[in-house]
């Protein structure tokens, strides 16, 4: 997996003592008030009371985390950074700064850029920009189809080799089942997941609101649940048939 910026390099130099916080770490089955020693960017010790005598406080930054929760960094697998091409909506710096402020240390960005991330040139641009502008790890997701238009496959192998961790057409379903089948065969061989937008557009295309009480009350075209359910069924069947990884 490609790490896209200097975030890990900064962590490697970090020495911290975090006191008086509540640690929530499911990987260690910890959910209690406890102190943490971080040495060279890694958790070295959990302890109660005062730091050990052999810890030189001059070499550590001391943080009082009273009334705070401490946890491993969060991961968001579906982020819209919109860079390149749509930076009036978001860019790599603003998006990663916002993520860091919310406790997210790794994010995966969808290919809904302009042009869409369907080739190595765009993937490399994202990684290079993230190296310069991001405080956190950014992992690009490449498009399944060229321009996300569903007509032909994107450069999936090349994009994964350049640093993409998964493939997706983001908010567009791959309507052509044969194309999705071929994409899943490629993704299986490479070992990356397909992140699927599940929708049967023939049922949802005229809808503006979920079909139900309020669509009827306000006489608005509704989107039935079955439009998503049919999409999920199809994608699961293709994933089962190809034995590939799918994230729905």
Where are these regions (language model features)?
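Active-site gating/metal-coordination segments in enzymes
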Residues: 132, 139-142, 147-183
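N-terminal metal-binding scaffold of metallo-dependent hydrolase/deaminase domains
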Residues: 1-56
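Metal-associated gating/positioning segment near the N- to mid-region
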Residues: 68-130
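Hydrophobic faces of well-ordered beta-strands that scaffold small-molecule active sites
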Residues: 73-79, 107, 138-142, 167-168, ...
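Active-site gating loops and adjacent loop-to-helix segments of metal-dependent hydrolytic enzymes
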Residues: 102-104, 128-137, 200-242
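Conserved small/polar residues in nucleotide/adenosyl-binding loops
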Residues: 247-248
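Alpha-helix-loop-beta-strand connector modules within alpha/beta enzyme cores
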Residues: 120-136, 186-196
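Active-site metal-binding motif and surrounding structural segment of the metallo-beta-lactamase
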Residues: 52-70
């Amino acid at each position: 997996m490609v790490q896209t910026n200097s975030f890990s390099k900064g962590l490697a130099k970090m020495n911290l003592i975090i006191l008086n916080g509540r640690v929530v770490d499911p990987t260690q089955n910890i959910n209690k008030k406890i102190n943490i020693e971080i040495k060279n960017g890694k958790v070295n010790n959990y302890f109660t009371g005062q730091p050990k005598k052999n810890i030189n406080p001059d070499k550590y930054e001391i943080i009082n985390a009273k009334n705070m929760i401490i946890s491993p960094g969060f991961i968001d697998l579906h982020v819209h950074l919109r860079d390149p091409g749509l930076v009036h909506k978001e860019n790599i710096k603003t998006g990663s700064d916002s993520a860091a402020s919310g406790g997210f240390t790794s994010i995966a960005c969808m290919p809904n850029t302009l042009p869409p991330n369907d080739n190595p040139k765009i993937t490399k641009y994202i990684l290079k920009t993230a190296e310069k502008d991001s405080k956190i790890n950014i992992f690009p997701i490449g498009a399944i189809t060229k321009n996300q238009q569903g007509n032909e496959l994107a450069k999936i192998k090349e994009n994964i080799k350049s640093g993409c961790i998964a493939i997706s057409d983001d908010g567009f379903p791959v309507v052509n089942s044969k194309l999705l089948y071929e994409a899943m065969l490629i993704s299986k061989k490479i070992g990356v997941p397909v992140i699927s937008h599940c929708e049967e557009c023939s049922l949802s295309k005229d809808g503006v609101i979920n079909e139900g009480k309020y669509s009827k009350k306000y006489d608005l075209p509704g989107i039935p649940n079955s439009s998503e359910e049919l999409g999920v069924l199809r994608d699961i069947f293709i994933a089962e048939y190809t034995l590939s990884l799918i994230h729905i």
